[in-house]
Swiss-Prot record:
Binds 2 magnesium ions per tetramer. Its EC number is 6.1.1.20. It comes from Francisella philomiragia subsp. philomiragia (strain ATCC 25017 / CCUG 19701 / FSC 153 / O#319-036). One of its GO terms (molecular function) is ATP binding. This is Phenylalanine--tRNA ligase alpha subunit. Pfam families: Phe_tRNA-synt_N, tRNA-synt_2d.
Length: 337
């Protein structure tokens, strides 16, 4: 039995030197594992006289139990220390001032789009969208701009291939809508458009909203009244609006809509180049050829169309003088909205 006591004492001496869980497990395996030293002592029982067997078995079991209890106690201390360390590292001082979350806001272009859509929805217009990679057919041909037409020079176009472009306007949505829907039609088509131009007032990508109304007995007076009401609503002012004759291949007659300068109330300033007027959108009565391309009978139905640059309206509403600021992701700029 002396050898069992010596083995037990040796195990406890080694146990006292252990400082981590891995070393602790090594001792458990060394003495209590299937091939452990104390476990191996049980095999000697078969070689002993019958009267000695119970004594050795009892001594080994007592030693194994004492060592297992000591190992469990030490393991519990290690786990408690680990838990305390983790709790300390994750400790929260509830007396400290909280860290607030920064509140985001909508981009000014998004706000402008929302204002535009809200007005026209209130006036019975639906919102329609279309592909940004558009066919030459929908971007030009159906809008009375054939391949030989000089008006194509007005557009600095990004060509994907010989028959597809990055759309230069959202007018193609109007044709697609007329093809699938008979009058009365009231839609606006907001979206990104692309032109090869970049300066203080132009970017290669910008946003447009185009509108279309097709019905019986539609007149230019209806168009003027709608757009005047829109500008008054958008700028929250009772504005003077004038319509100047212009040219667009897809409308006849065509006009440019100017409004009283919102910066100087029409008195003349740098923004309006001291004229008192600001050009804000183009419009006109839908050309019969465009109605025909959309499978609309131009003898029985008339329509008007209009288009506006969203960034242009944003700049005027918020007093921004450089279009490129909308796309620079500068928080100093965006936080103002």
């Amino acid at each position: 039995m002396q050898i069992v006591d010596q083995m037990r004492d040796q195990a406890f001496e080694e146990l006292n030197l252990v400082n981590d869980k891995k070393s602790l497990d090594d001792i458990r395996v060394k003495y209590l594992g299937k091939k452990g030293e104390l476990t191996g002592m049980m095999r000697l029982i078969a070689t002993l006289p019958n009267e000695e067997k119970p004594k050795l078995g009892q001594a080994v079991n007592i030693a194994k139990e004492a060592l297992q209890n000591a190992i469990n106690e030490k393991l519990a201390k290690f786990e408690e220390a680990e838990l305390n360390e983790k709790l300390a590292s994750e400790k929260i001082d509830v007396t400290l001032k909280g860290v607030g979350q920064n509140q985001g806001s909508l981009h000014p272009v998004t706000k402008t789009l929302n204002r535009i859509e809200a007005f026209f929805k209130q006036n019975g217009f639906a919102v329609e969208v279309g592909p940004e990679i558009e066919s030459d057919y929908y971007n030009f041909e159906t809008l009375n701009i054939p391949s030989h037409h000089p008006a194509r020079a007005m557009h600095d176009t990004f060509y994907i291939d010989d028959t597809h472009v990055l759309r230069t306007h959202t007018s193609g949505v109007q044709i697609r809508t007329m093809e699938k829907q008979q009058p009365p039609i009231r839609i606006i088509a907001p979206g990104r458009v692309y032109r090869c131009d970049s300066d203080i007032t132009h970017t290669p990508m910008f946003h447009q909203v185009e509108g279309l109304l097709v019905d019986k007995d539609v007149s230019f007076a209806d168009l003027k009244g709608l757009l005047h009401a829109f500008l008054n609503s958008f700028f929250e002012k009772d504005l003077k609006v004038r319509f100047r004759p212009s040219y667009f291949p897809f409308t006849e007659p065509s006009a440019e809509a100017d409004m009283e300068c919102v910066m100087c109330d029409g008195k003349g300033c740098r923004v309006c180049k001291h004229t008192g007027w600001l050009e804000v959108l183009g419009c006109g009565m839908v050309h019969p050829k465009v109605l025909k391309a959309g499978n609309i009978d131009s003898e029985n139905y008339q329509g008007f169309a209009f288009g506006m640059g969203v960034e242009r309206l944003s700049m005027l509403r918020y007093g921004i003088d450089d279009l490129r600021m909308f796309f620079e992701n500068d928080l100093r700029f965006l936080k103002q909205f």
